[in-house]
A protein has these predicted regions:
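NAD(P)H-binding glycine-rich loop region in Rossmannoid oxidoreductase-like domains
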Residues: 1-26, 30-33, 45-49
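Mid/C-terminal beta-alpha module of Rossmann-like enzyme folds, strongest
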Residues: 127-189, 202-258
């Protein structure tokens, strides 16, 4: 069984604990009942305990449940996966189409190694087939680049040239909180702010690399970015209040007239 469930923000009763920890516990129990021989879990590259981020900590707790399950397993600690509908190319593209200024995280550049979704799927298949000997491995893309360079590359493919403004990490965390409160899908979630502040290129704690023949080889190039570009930009429909108002109007329209 492949276990990829996860959230990057909490919504109502969909908390990090319920989705990451309780959800993983349920997968393990179901695997035992049905005689599943292998669990492949997709985790996060820097999931770890005691780091101050509920996302990272609950992902780590889920990893530990799998490790202690007694079932043969492979834990894939993956970095930033991109493709249509992602939270990287999608959100950056819509942001640079909407605003003339783009905020970059911190005054010291962090790095990222983006993984195209098709290569992430290939790694999942290899893990299911037992071709990855280590029980825990790091999964990162072939190309390492600074986050600012990745953003500029996306903006270039999207045909935009915004002004880039470095802002302190605390400001990105504040932006994340505000957009979680106000947007249906936030521009950046608090968990993602932590990821951007740290960079997404090195595993923490250490995990070995994939076998050479399974490692991603595709660069973060124009063709792959273009394939992941979304339509449109951010608008009023992305706001929670607009969604609420539309729901109220539908409700009123459905009521019988007197």
């Amino acid at each position: 069984v492949v276990h990829c469930a996860g959230i990057n923000r909490e919504i109502g009763d969909q908390t990090f604990d319920r989705v990451h920890v309780d959800g993983t516990r349920a997968v393990i129990e179901a695997a035992r009942r049905t005689g599943v021989k292998r669990i492949v879990m997709l985790s996060f590259l820097r999931a770890r305990p005691d780091c101050g981020s509920p996302y990272h900590e609950t992902k780590w707790a889920a990893e530990e449940l799998v490790r202690r399950s007694g079932i043969d397993h492979t834990i894939l600690k993956a970095g930033m996966i991109y493709g249509p509908g992602d939270h990287m190319v999608d959100h950056v593209t819509r942001a640079v189409r909407t605003w003339p200024v783009f905020a970059t995280v911190g005054y010291r550049e962090r790095t990222v190694r983006p993984i195209p979704v098709e290569e992430a799927v290939n790694v999942l298949i290899a893990a299911l087939e037992g071709r990855i000997p280590s029980p825990t491995v790091a999964v990162v893309g072939a190309e390492e680049l600074e986050l600012g360079a990745a953003v500029r590359r996306i903006a270039q493919v999207a045909g935009r040239r915004p002004v880039y403004l470095p802002v302190p990490v605390w400001a990105i965390r504040l932006l994340a909180q505000l957009t979680e409160w106000t947007m249906v899908v936030p521009l950046v979630a608090k968990a993602q702010a932590q990821m951007l502040a740290e960079g997404v290129s090195e595993p923490s704690p250490f995990a070995p690399e994939l076998p050479e023949e399974i490692r991603p080889v595709l660069r973060f190039d124009v063709d792959r970015i273009h394939a992941a570009l979304p339509d449109g930009r951010f608008g009023l429909s992305d706001l929670r209040i607009a969604q609420w108002w539309a729901g109220q109007r539908r409700h009123q329209a459905g009521r019988p007239s007197r």
